[in-house]
Amino acid sequence: MNQRKRKKAARHLVTAALLGDAPRVRALLRAGADPDHADGDGTTPLYQASVQGDAETARLLLAAGARPDTESGRGSEGTPLCAAACWGYTGTVRVLLAGGADPNLPEDHGTGWTPLEWADRGPHPETAAVLVAAGAVRRVPSP
């Protein structure tokens, strides 16, 4: 697949992830779309799937090599795990953790919160419990 076609496929991949169109995501990945390629706003397919709570699409993207800890939106949107934890998408959180997401990684350019802080503020106790079981640690606030 040439560079132009790869870019086009990657744009379609972000849209398919947003829409929760797992069959389309699967087809685009088979056609060679880069699972980490962000759209013009810097949004990654994995972030889109995570913020929608689409565990199936997240699983497909991770299996295709998407990096679970990449911040989306050039850092302004945060990580896929923070996005899923924020909305209490426990199934997606489990998929991301199984795919290697760091349960203690704070957003760098966003709020600076960890996935557990997002889940606690939800409040999403089931999601928080899954994160703690995966090794997430509650940070002590600075004075």
Give residue spans per PLM region:
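N-terminal segments that cap or nucleate solenoid repeat domains
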Residues: 2-40
